[in-house]
């Protein structure tokens, strides 16, 4: 359930600022605090209007349900949510009674991206990223990696860092009302949470570029056509269907499941070089004049004029 103290809506300008460059902060906030702070610092620190998020965890036999629970803030990903996801994935990995997770978002949207102001504050204070070892990167950007599968159920908005979190799963179910976006290029940065690698691999080069280079949105049926979604179901049924699939996975031989994932990931080992190169490029764009121009334009309520520098 949502936090009852979370009663004030997020203003449009603040929401856009938080969403802008979400992938960059998500990728670096977990892997490199210094670089992530440079990205977050490019967005003005604004007063917080909503309470922190949380992750709701529920066990159903061998299935672990992991819910992003910040609906009144459109499930924007703040440090408590990112830490909660990392700890839930750690629990999945190290509890032998658990075989598969189902990731979902509470409320109207799966997630509209990252809460940049909250991340900037946490990075500056040293509260994020977590320093203990009971944590697995939910974006799969750095080790330790999980060896058990994640099924994701999405609805409403799946955008920016929320879309990259979605792409980091293994099996995907979407409601008919789902809208996807990976539009960081319209905000002076680029997708830094893995979309440039995963979306290109799964949807094909031109299909991925069609959306990542324009910032256009796409729907559930288009996502299925692109191969990013495996099933589209009536709105409201997505979580039940994801759990049904997860139960089938949980009934299979655990060693066989893990071996299948491990073998499949070995075929993608060359992508480690691309993942490793994300941080340097993110830092360069976070400090660019175009990124600063986007923030100024958002504050002045006008269209940005990018100069390519």
Predicted regions and their residues:
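Terminal peptide-recognition signature
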Residues: 66, 70, 85, 103, ...
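C-terminal long alpha-helix characteristic of the crotonase
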Residues: 43, 49, 71, 173-178, ...
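N-terminal secretory signal peptides
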Residues: 1-13
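N-terminal twin-arginine translocation
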Residues: 11-16, 25-43
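Short, active-site-adjacent cap segments at secondary-structure transitions
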Residues: 108-112, 159-160, 264
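Crotonase-fold acyl-CoA enzyme core
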Residues: 11, 56, 79, 141-255, ...
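Conserved CoA-thioester-binding segment of acyl-CoA-metabolizing enzymes
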Residues: 2, 16, 20, 39-106
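An acidic, glycine-rich surface segment that forms the CoA-thioester-binding/catalytic face
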Residues: 82, 86, 90, 94, ...
């Amino acid at each position: 359930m949502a936090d009852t103290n979370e009663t004030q809506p997020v203003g449009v300008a603040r929401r856009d600022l938080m969403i802008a460059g979400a992938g960059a902060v998500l990728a670096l906030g977990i892997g490199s605090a210094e670089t992530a702070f440079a990205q977050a610092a490019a967005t003005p620190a604004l007063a917080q209007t909503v309470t922190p998020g949380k992750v709701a965890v529920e066990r159903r036999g061998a299935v672990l349900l992991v819910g992003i629970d910040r609906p009144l803030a459109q499930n924007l990903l703040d440090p408590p949510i990112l830490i909660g996801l990392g700890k839930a994935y750690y629990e999945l990995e190290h509890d032998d009674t658990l075989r598969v997770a189902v990731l979902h978002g509470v409320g109207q949207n799966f997630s509209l991206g990252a809460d940049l102001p909250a991340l900037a504050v946490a990075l500056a204070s040293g509260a994020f990223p977590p320093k203990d070892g009971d944590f697995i990167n939910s974006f799969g950007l750095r080790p330790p990696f999980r060896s058990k599968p994640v099924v994701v159920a999405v609805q409403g908005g799946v955008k920016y860092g929320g879309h990259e979190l979605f792409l980091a799963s293994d099996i995907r179910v979407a409601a008919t009302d789902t809208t996807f976006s990976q539009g960081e290029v319209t905000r002076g940065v680029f997708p830094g949470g893995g979309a440039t690698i995963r979306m290109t691999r799964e949807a094909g080069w031109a299909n991925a570029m069609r959306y990542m280079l324009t910032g256009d949105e796409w729907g559930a049926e288009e996502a299925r056509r692109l191969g990013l979604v495996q099933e589209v179901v009536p709105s409201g049924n997505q979580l039940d269907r994801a759990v049904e699939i997860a139960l089938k996975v949980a009934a299979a031989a655990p060693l066989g499941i893990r071996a299948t994932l491990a073998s499949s990931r070995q075929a993608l080992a060359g992508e480690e070089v691309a993942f490793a190169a994300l941080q340097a490029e993110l830092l360069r764009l976070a400090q660019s004049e175009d990124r600063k121009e986007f923030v100024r334009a958002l504050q002045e309520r006008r269209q940005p004029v990018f100069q390519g520098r």
